[in-house]
Design a protein with these regions (language model features):
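Hydrophobic transmembrane alpha-helices and their immediate junctions
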Residues: 263, 375-415
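Long extracytoplasmic/lumenal interhelical loops at the membrane interface
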Residues: 313-377
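Aromatic-anchored transmembrane helix interface
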Residues: 77-91, 102-121, 125-152, 165-168, ...
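Transmembrane alpha-helices of multi-pass inner-membrane enzymes
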Residues: 42, 405-414, 420-454
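Alpha-helical transmembrane segments of multi-pass inner-membrane proteins
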Residues: 145-146, 159-189, 202-271
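N-terminal signal-anchor transmembrane segment
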Residues: 1-95, 115-121, 411-413
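Helix-loop-helix junctions and helix-breaking kinks within/between transmembrane helices
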Residues: 19-32, 71-79, 131-135, 201-208, ...
């Protein structure tokens, strides 16, 4: 009961926080620093046994808050979310060390370096070398260090639920902020293009991605942490509210990623559950479907049917659009051409964007981390991708009972292919898949036998 009250209080607090940030965006800076010092204090003062958990909670919270802090200008820098995750995992390494079995991720980090030297000779004179390199490599470095720290770290299912809760709480605050920012969607949506106003005044792609993460986390919570009917209704309602605003950003990537990850999660969760638990899963699945269907109908109603046209790949007049990928396929092909032209050392970090500026007059950032990695890192990029894809399968082979592995890997893979690594989120999600998740051992209670006097 006490846990449920604490959970509801945390939701209420973050909902109010979203309102306060809407009323006064200057509160974003104090919010950022209070959260930062709070988690630093928790990590430093934690016992050795709980320090890994505290590090992961800190990372999770700032992953969930990253887009909200960008929206409200609360971060000290645009890439602060990635830098803080790097800071926290480095602290974790200092206190807890790393597994020797994770050495391929050290190789992965080393293979990022040659592209910097190549970029020093290929980037145009007008390009800002330091900021361009930092923007492109901060995500991959964040992933590599997070993976090094998390690889084979033993953690319980209850602890990973806590980590996911810390990740979704700031997303709840962000959702509240968006509702107050745009209370009436009909006022701002007039086409099927991605809508910045409906996304709370920030890039719809990033907002859709982070709200998609919220959908995924709340769906998991609905199945694993909803012991009572009121909690089931509460979690299903929050899921519906997040989903509604994710859909109405008119950016499809985050929503599709979330739904795919939820389906994969349910498959493995159901498969690893006992017969009695499976009956409960089926009933909750019905509640999930009702919540999502109701949300869809509300979104269609509030947008005058434009959401339906968007997901059917049509414009506001109902005409079929030429491309389903909204220009991403052209970017992908261009980056593959870069790989073919420089297959050994690549074209250099950030050069793909730089080339688009020279050729088209505008530097559209890559949406696919795979094609960007191949183009900018060459043969080293091929090895990097092989490490990222195949190394996790080793830990999966040693822990087949972890039903979070494939959903997390799927979420990472789909995210980096629709928005690259603009956020710290895909890096941290990937690292979570490398944790060695086990059931908690129940303490054995033995009766003490007293010697009887004769």
């Amino acid at each position: 009961m006490k846990t449920n009250i604490t959970y509801i209080s945390a939701i209420a607090f973050h909902s109010v926080l979203g309102l306060l940030l809407y009323l006064n965006e200057s509160l974003g800076k104090p919010y950022f620093f209070i959260a930062l010092f709070y988690f630093l204090y928790r990590i430093i003062t934690a016992s050795d046994k709980s320090r890994t958990l505290e590090v992961l909670k800190a990372c999770a919270y700032f992953v969930g808050a990253e887009v909200l802090l960008r929206t409200t200008k609360g971060s000290i820098s645009y890439e602060a979310g990635k830098y803080l995750v790097i800071l926290f995992v480095l602290m974790g390494m200092f206190y807890k060390g790393i597994s020797g079995k994770g050495y391929p991720y050290f190789i992965y980090l080393l293979f990022l370096i040659p592209s910097i030297f190549v970029a020093s000779t290929t980037l145009s004179f007008d390009a800002n070398f330091r900021t361009n390199i930092a923007f492109v490599l901060s995500g991959p470095v964040c992933l590599g260090l997070s993976a090094l720290f998390c690889y084979d770290k033993r953690i319980s299912y209850n602890q990973i639920s806590q980590i996911m809760l810390f990740m979704v709480l700031p997303i709840i605050a962000h959702t509240a902020y968006i509702y107050f920012y745009t209370p009436n969607l009909k006022d701002v949506i007039s086409s099927t293009a991605s809508n910045r106003a409906a996304a709370g005044g920030w890039g719809a792609n990033q907002v859709s991605a982070i709200l998609g993460l919220g959908m995924f986390l709340m769906a998991i919570r609905l199945f694993t942490k909803s012991a009572t009917l009121p909690l089931k209704i509460l979690n299903a309602s929050i899921l519906g509210l997040i989903t509604l605003r994710a859909i109405t950003t008119m950016s499809r990537g985050g929503v599709i990623t979330a739904i795919a990850a939820i389906v994969i999660y349910l498959f493995y969760y159901y498969r690893h559950s006992k017969v009695r638990k499976r009956n409960e899963i089926i009933s909750i699945f019905g509640l999930l479907c009702v919540s999502l269907m109701l949300t869809w109908f509300v979104s269609v109603s509030q947008t005058g049917g434009l959401v339906g046209l968007r997901y059917a790949n049509k414009d506001h007049l109902g005409r079929e659009k030429e491309s389903l990928t909204t220009g991403r396929s052209e970017l992908f092909e261009g980056e593959l051409e870069g790989f073919i032209s420089s297959p050994f050392f690549g074209i250099g970090s950030s050069r793909a964007k730089d080339e688009r500026i020279e050729q088209e007059g505008q530097g559209v950032t890559s949406h696919s981390e795979f094609s960007r990695t191949l183009a900018e890192h060459g043969i080293f990029g091929v090895i990097i991708l092989l490490i990222l894809i195949f190394k996790p399968l080793e830990i999966r082979g040693r822990n087949r009972g972890n039903y979070y592995f494939y959903p997390l890997m799927a979420f990472w893979f789909l995210t980096i292919n629709h928005m690259s690594m603009r956020l710290a989120m895909p890096a941290f999600i990937y690292a979570l898949a490398l944790l060695n998740v086990k059931n908690e051992k129940r303490p054995l209670y033995r009766k003490q036998l007293k010697e009887q006097k004769v």
